[in-house]
Amino acid sequence: MKKIIVSALFAGFAMQGFAQSGTNSPYSQYGLGALATQATGFNRGMNGLAYGFHEHNQVNHMNPASYSAVDSLSFIFDAGLSLQLTNFDEGGHKVNAHNADIEYIVASFRAFKHVGVSFGLLPYSNVGYNFSNKRNVNAFPSPSSPSTTYSNTYSGDGGLHQVYLGAGWEPFKGFSFGANISYLWGTLNRYTTNSYSDSYVNTISRNYTAEIKNYKLDFGTQYTHSITKKDELTLGLTYSLGHKLNSNTECNLISTNSQTGVSDTTHYMISNAFELPHTIGIGLMWNHNNHLKIGVDYQLQKWAKILYPRLSGTGSATTFALADGFFKDRHRLTLGGDYCRGERYRGFFDRMHYRAGVSYTSPYLKINGADGPRELSASLGVGIPIINGYNNRSILNISAEWVNQSATGLIKENMFRINVGLTFNERWFAKFKVE
């Protein structure tokens, strides 16, 4: 038990160190950042498939109703990390970037009969980008040069994290429901600088900052119906409450004289600037004899009516206010499955899990009035049993994931990610007979 607590504390501190390196995407400059997958190790092998799954030896926090299925004598601790390589392509200009991230730390145990409890730490979104462009200003009127170049530099960092506590209860066989309550916190920092080669033209900087601290509520239910002696079907439903985050955002507009270094700063602030969307999920999972599980998930995030801060106008007419037209509703469809010949078989490969999944996610960002990137992704994964004299219930989950984000006239992203998750399944409260 002490080892588990120490591991959890160490992983928690490590997550804080890696949290801001979870993305290199320029698209993380919009909204709350690049939205995190939030799936655990076994889900990631199926590309995030989750709503209809309830496992006795895995933590599925994406539907809290599943906690009721956790083994009565087990304590499950699961932590995962990812390594990713991303290729960015804009008009034939290609750049590669790589980064690593601790993705999640979750745990679960049986509290009472038919009642499971889970808690954990995971990212909600990531902000991390740094890019620039340079152009000529043709025939720019200037005392020092007939032609001037200007450059725009964009950078950002931060993200949102959440720690949650949840419970799931099965009041009667086949039906369960549960809830997670989370504390959501983090900072969003974004910086834009417009500078000119002509020293007579001021450099303009726009620094946007926000600090968010609020709650998040998720609810879930599952119903399992036996079709035959070997086949059953599970319907999973989830709902996440959308609400204002009661957080302010600030913008500092800085004009700097390139010759004298003298700056003039104008400060703007918007109260209650950010909001979480209402989110609905529905999933169906077919289970054949606990060997083959195939499922489909659909998720809807209601972003369309959410407002977002916008700086507009020039000079004394500059305004910083909430505006619409930045988002669309986000739809995600996932299909995947898991095959294992049987956990009680003696053969090593018979006890392995083989997983696969594919997803399509519709654009939810509006960039310069046009639809942002849509996302295609696919994954393959395995669950490798850890067998030794002390414990044969733990699992090493490894998966490979490909993600493509693209939109007409915008940057194309191709990301290859390796996910590694280690699920410790510790046997608690067992009575041992001494001869």
Q: Each predicted region: which residue ranges?
A:
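Single-residue recognition of alpha-helix boundary sites
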Residues: 13-14, 74, 89, 184, ...
